[in-house]
């Protein structure tokens, strides 16, 4: 009888822990977030002249551990001119919170907020699950907000 009680206790405890655990979003979801932010910045990623690349390819942990990172590049059509990095977006794997890495700009606008809420509902996260993001990406002191366009 004790063994049966212990089994049910263990099963209930592991189920509660599994529900409490926050899952991370998938790479493709983070890429979608970065594309939403790029459109907000009036950047059209067309995969010909303006491309989006992952910056997370060098190590398994990624460019910045805990975050997906994407660069948007205008590719040169001439060997005499270099490619131009237009933006570098960093997306939290937990909350889909998004920053531009070089400008230290935090994004918040209705379309992005809705997408973030939908993702957090799926992953079990909430907006407070990644409070150290500005510090982790090196933007703690110079952060600025990019609100929705009026």
PLM features per residue range, with description:
Residues 21-58, 122-130:
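Short, non-transmembrane alpha-helical segments in secretory-pathway proteins
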Residues 28, 32, 36, 74-77, ...:
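Contiguous hydrophobic segments
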Residues 102-150:
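C-terminal partner/receptor-binding element of secreted or periplasmic proteins
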Residues 47-97:
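Exposed beta-strand-loop-beta-strand "reactive/processing" segments of non-cytosolic proteins
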Residues 1-4:
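Positively charged n-region of N-terminal signal peptides that target proteins for export
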Residues 7-8, 98:
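A broad, structure-centric signal for solvent-exposed, well-ordered loop/edge residues
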Residues 9-18:
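Hydrophobic h-region of N-terminal signal peptides that target proteins for export
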């Amino acid at each position: 009888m004790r063994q049966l009680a212990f089994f049910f206790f263990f099963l209930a405890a592991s189920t509660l822990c599994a529900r409490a655990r926050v899952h991370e979003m998938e790479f493709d979801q983070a890429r979608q977030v970065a594309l939403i932010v790029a459109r907000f910045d009036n950047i059209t990623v067309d995969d010909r002249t303006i491309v989006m690349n992952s910056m997370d390819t060098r190590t398994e942990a990624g460019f910045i551990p805990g975050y997906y990172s994407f660069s948007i590049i205008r590719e040169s059509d001439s060997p005499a001119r270099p490619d131009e990095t237009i933006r570098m977006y960093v997306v939290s794997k937990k909350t889909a919170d998004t920053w531009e890495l070089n400008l230290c700009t935090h994004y918040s606008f209705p379309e992005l907020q809705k997408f973030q809420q939908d993702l957090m509902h799926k992953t079990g996260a909430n907006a407070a699950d990644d409070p150290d993001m500005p510090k982790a990406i090196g933007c703690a002191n110079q952060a600025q907000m990019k609100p929705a366009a009026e």
